[in-house]
């Protein structure tokens, strides 16, 4: 299994076992769904989501079988993961982390391999050498055969 980090448990909320997750993950609507499985901590202990709501900047989750704050306190400070195989995206969506290692082109010109995907508040950003490319439809033309084609935007390269 390949795990994708989707956030960190920063605290509990109330006394009924609800936890606060701080997450910048782009596809929250596909992850934080009742019945989905999340993995927590270094040991990747699995939990089933019982409820979800968004509150201020936090993703608030309860897990099946946990109804008391004392049962979830030990999770505080742990990272939360989803199994990549469980992450089902819409037809044309690709999880940005999968793009690492893809070749990047502006038109027919090869500009390098995608080295890293930065999770920024506005959008994910693809790092190709010293070039940073926002992972938004205005910049990405198409993705196929392990290649990403980006628009030739003045000042980008």
Regions found by a protein language model. Name each.
Residues 1-157:
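Short Lys/Arg-rich amphipathic alpha-helical segments
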